[in-house]
Amino acid sequence: MFERSIPEWLRPPPASAAKKPGARAFATLTGVESMIRGTLLSVFPLAMYSALGSAAAVSQVYFAIGLLSLMVGLMLPWINRLVPRRWLYTIGAMFYAAGGLCGAMGGLMVVVSLVLCTLGTVTCFICLNAYVLDYIAKSELGRTETLRMFYSAASWTLGPVAGVALLNLWPPAPFLLAVVFSLVQVSVFWWMRLGNGKLIQKARGAAPNPLAFLGRFFAQPRLIAGWLFAVLRSCGWWGYIVYLPIYAIESGLPQQTGGILVSVTNSFLFITPLMLRWVQRHSVRAGVRLGFLCTALGFLLAALSPVPVLAVAALFSGSVFLILLDVSGGLPFLMAVKPSERTEMAAVYSSFRDVSGILTPGIGALILLVAPIQGIFAAVGLGLGAMFLLAGRLHPMLGVAPAERGRRRAA
C-alpha cells in the first residue's frame, strides 16, 4: 500500500534498467578527486620543507610514507573481500578529509596530513581502476584514460598555483579547501551508484593471500614492463613536483616558481585528446618511447646546467612529455590484464605510486649526502632513459586504431 503512494520519479530504477557507467562517468569522478590532489600538489613539498627544515629530512619522511602506502596498497584486495568496494572508496575519500584537517593545524601535523592523503590516494586509485576494468572494454581504455586526464586538467592546472597562493595568504586555507573537495567527491561517488563492481564468478574456495597474486604478476613479462613504465614515469613526476620547488628555493628563485611551472605543465592536459590521436596513429610504443626519451633529456640537461634558470627551463621542457607518458604509459599494463584478475592486478599496478614514492626519496636522500639536488635530477634522467630502451620491446602495433592498422596492412 505504501509503495503505491510513492511517486514514480522518486522510485529507484530496477537493476535491469540501470545504466552502465561509461568513460565520462569515471572521468567525472577522477576530475573531482583531482581538485583535492591538485590543490595540495605543490603545497606539501613547501609545507614539509618549512616544517622539517631540509631537503634530506623531507626525502626521509616521503620514503617512510611510501613504504606504508605500498603495504596498504598490496593488502587492499584482501580487505576488499571483507569490505565492499563502495565503502572502501568512501573510506579513501574520508582519508583526504582527515588529512586536510590535520594539515590545517600546521607544524609537524603536516606529516600526518601527508600520510592520510597518501592513503586516500592509493585507496581511491585502486578502487577506481578496478571499476574501470570492470566496465570499460579494452578498446576503450585509451579513450577513458584520456578523458580522465582531460576532465582533471583544470584542477591540475589551477590547483598548484592556487594552493601555493592560499598557503602564502593563510597556511590552513589550501587544506580546508581540500576537505570541502573531499566531501564533494563522496557525494558524487554515491550519486553515481557504482556499487561494488561486477561479479566475475562465485568463489569456490577460501580467499587467497593477496601477496599470492605477485606470482601471477611476475609470470607475465608484459605486466612487468607496463608496471616499470608507470614506476619511472611517476619517478619523473616526483623529481619535478617535489624537488623542483625545493631546488628553486635553495637557488634563490621565488617560492611560487614550482607551483607556477607545475600548473603550466598540467595545462597541457587539455591537449591529451590530440596526444591520444597521435598515439593511435603511430602506436603506444612510439608514444612511450618519445615520452621517455624527451623527459630523460630534460632531466639530464637540468642536472648538468650550472645556471638555475636554465636548469628549471630544462625540467619544464621535459615535463611536457610526462603528460604524453600519462596518456600512453599506462596502456601496456591495462591492455594485458586478464578479466579474472582485475581487482588484484589493479592493486599491483597502483603500487607504482608507492614504489616510486620509496625509490625517489630513498635514493634522493642518499644522493643528498654527497651531492646537491641536481644529483637527483641526474638519477631520474638515467632511469627514464632505461625505460626508453625497454619500450623498444613493445609490439609496434600496440594501441594503433583498427582503421589505421588496416591501412598499414593494405599498404
Residue ranges and their predicted role:
Residues 55-56, 138-148, 255, 337-349:
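Loop-to-transmembrane helix entry/capping segments in MFS-fold secondary transporters
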Residues 340-369:
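A late C-terminal transmembrane helix in Major Facilitator Superfamily
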Residues 87-101, 286-301:
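Structural signature of the two symmetry-related core transmembrane helices
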Residues 123-136, 324-337:
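Intracellular juxtamembrane helix-capping segments at the cytosolic ends
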Residues 9-66, 222-261:
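Helix-loop boundary and gating motifs at the non-cytosolic
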Residues 174-191, 377-392:
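Symmetry-related core transmembrane helices of the 12-TM Major Facilitator Superfamily/SLC fold
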Residues 2-23, 196-228, 410-411:
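Juxtamembrane intracellular "pre-TM" segments in multi-pass secondary transporters
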Residues 72-84, 271-284, 368:
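Helix-to-loop junctions at the C-terminal end of transmembrane segments
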